Amino acid sequence: MLSLFNIALKTLKNHIEFLKHDKDILTHLGLCCKNYDLIHKCSECGNICPNRQQHGTCININYLLIYAVKCDNYMLAYRLLCWGANEKFAHYFRRPLPNLKPLLPKKELTPKDIKQLAYEHFYSDSELITVFEVFRRCRNINDCLEFFYKKNLEFEIYFARLHVYSKTFYRKSWYWFCIFMAVKHGMKQALKKITKTYIPTFYNKTTLNLVLFLSACFYENVEWMKYFFYKANKKIQQRMLSYGMEWAATHGKVRTFVCCYTLGGTASLKMYQKAYQNERYMIMALCSYLGNIQINNPWDNLNPYMMMQNKEKFLPLKFSEETQYFYI
């Protein structure tokens, strides 16, 4: 197993990214000042001085290391270790690794058990199916899961989106958690098992395929987007494309946007305005080009050849000289 130091070393990219990443967290500890000059090592005691203040206001460097590890903040941990923090503190307070063995639902799971499961990223369909069966047989599981999706921005956005469609959202959040993991990691076998076991109740004109399509949009999983799209009828397909492009324009999902466009979606003025509102310049550029919308914007006079010059921004899109379109 890699030491925390090695993990942090691999995670670290540059100092500027580190400082911006930790600004909000360190603000709560009184360590933040202007220009992201956040933490300073005390020359007298070797601990951390907030805002470059004098010795006497220092925070114990090992205490801050414990805080960093408990928050999975390896960027901060790396800097503290470089400054002489004791790595034993990091290992002692490291969160236990999840138990990969199948859990048999003989008894009610404790919140600690659920946390172990929720932190696991699942490496195979069988593991996710096992967890799904455990969740399905337990009581009061949603309270245990709540901590997870409230602390995970990606999961929180996903859940907020699903709440619009499903009547059983709160009572079946364990179900959506498993769907979320299956779509995220491309587990077809697990997804098939989960959707056969239970189908939630939706609001009017919403189907499971629509929700699964939006889940695939969330992760820009083009293969699954097309699969769920072609399983739906024409009315549902139109809603899929409308919601999918709106999602892409809001969150800057370029592959999702282009895939919806190739499936028949419209790069409309409405989508352009949605992207403009959220400062999604790539989507604005695509709307302007694909929808032939002549609007002054940061990507004015965009053409296929300019896009090819900036192809690293458009990868993995492929440009066809024959049709003058971009494809997935």
Swiss-Prot record:
Protein name: Protein MGF 300-4L
Lineage: superkingdom: Viruses
Protein family per UniProt: Belongs to the asfivirus MGF 300 family.
Other facts: Encoded by variable regions comprise the left 35-kb and the right 15-kb ends of the viral genome. Transcribed in host macrophages.
